[in-house]
Amino acid sequence: MSVIKEYRTVSEVVGPLMIVDQVAGVHFNELVEIQLHDGSKRQGQVLEVQEDKAMVQLFEGSSGINLEKAKVRFTGRPLELPVSEDMVGRIFNGMGKPIDGGPAILPEKYLDIDGQAINPVARDYPDEFIQTGISAIDHLNTLVRGQKLPVFSGSGLPHKELAAQIARQATVLNSDENFAVVFAAMGITFEEAEFFMNDLRETGAIDRSVLFINLANDPAIERIATPRIALTAAEYLAYEKDMHVLVIMTDMTNYCEALREVSAARREVPGRRGYPGYLYTNLSTLYERAGRLVGKKGSVTQIPILSMPEDDITHPIPDLTGYITEGQIILSRDLYNSGYRPPINVLPSLSRLKDKGSGEGKTRGDHAATMNQLFAAYAQGKQAKELAVVLGESALSETDKLYVRFTDRFEQEYINQGFQTNRTIEESLDLGWELLSILPRTELKRIKDDMIDQYLPQTKEEER
């Protein structure tokens, strides 16, 4: 049983950090309760212990703390989340407390928010398709169970609409299996929080979702705990309740800013652009909690969303995220300004596991071939359009003009599906074939003849 120690030896408060002197038997990551002179309580966590001094990070701000009158209790246990299957359909704040007006959760157990280290040998390979209803993802950058696939966005781009669309549309094709969405929002505005809650309520998706919302006016330090709390809930539902869980985390840039704030308060030597040198390690403790385990039916799949400062993909946050995760979905400002929704730039986007979740028995036998052909045709069409800008359309061959026509229709019909359209993978594949029918059959070099005979719309081919 944990021994609770109480001290009145607070010596310093700096930003979100508090220093407690003359402590003994205190451990890293230990949960701390602070009672103020007016009787109110706040929570914190031990960040560092040196000899008889403990550094505590405060989750609920440091304003109003009287150094002489504050009582600090070290609980002897880590920060834990009370979990239960009743969490599904509920909305919580960034620290896991209900904010939807419903009753408190009756927990089946309490789980450490930092999770458990997973033995690499115990991991199962991700290879089962998740349908998001978005053609540019399902067909061209396939998401599989257990994968971590981030979305790289920018300021002003509609990543919140994309996140809400994925949250309400995502599903596994085998309807007999339980599916849930855990949504973690960090540093979002009140309007954005209302948007997410109302969207999920109106569509009924809230019934299979768990929301954790940290607002922009909540303490920044709370943002460090929010994704860990959300992932703890996801792991519980996946590995103990056999559910397939999709975790959407937005905005990871706000999380990293909170890390930088704590690092600056600790007077640490800054790394790239002022972020702490351990940013890569810290992000990996979140992203690596995705996956499947041998012997477990459930899975945890992650879609972290981050806004790239100044649309800079070389910024430390997207740069390090790309090293850890298995691909990226990139939103394009040019497509957005042209009115395309969602503005997914498919050429630089990538899902490193897309070939594992596609094919006969998972999606359809023509998935991989049409994906490769669409990529090649779109790239060639973009090159032809650039050539026309420099030399004029008269410099284009008849085949080049067909590629330009294909590219225009690909963006207008395939990418520009809107945020309310939910396409099945079969609809995405059929639309891909319809667009490929614009091109001469001799240009479809990445697809076998028997597959072309089976799927290419005959009427279009005969018209040519």
Curated annotation (Swiss-Prot):
The keyword Chaperone does not apply. The keyword Membrane does not apply. It comes from the Bacteria. Gene3D superfamilies: 3.40.50.12240. Keywords: ATP synthesis, Hydrogen ion transport, Ion transport, Transport. CDD domains: ATP-synt_V_A-type_beta_C, ATP-synt_V_A-type_beta_N, V_A-ATPase_B. GO terms for molecular function: ATP binding; proton-transporting ATP synthase activity, rotational mechanism. It holds the Pfam family ATP-synt_ab. GO terms for biological process: proton motive force-driven plasma membrane ATP synthesis. Belongs to the ATPase alpha/beta chains family. Produces ATP from ADP in the presence of a proton gradient across the membrane. The V-type beta chain is a regulatory subunit. NCBIfam families: PRK04196.1. This is V-type ATP synthase beta chain. It comes from Streptococcus gordonii (strain Challis / ATCC 35105 / BCRC 15272 / CH1 / DL1 / V288). The lineage of its organism: Bacteria, Bacillati, Bacillota, Bacilli, Lactobacillales. The gene is atpB.
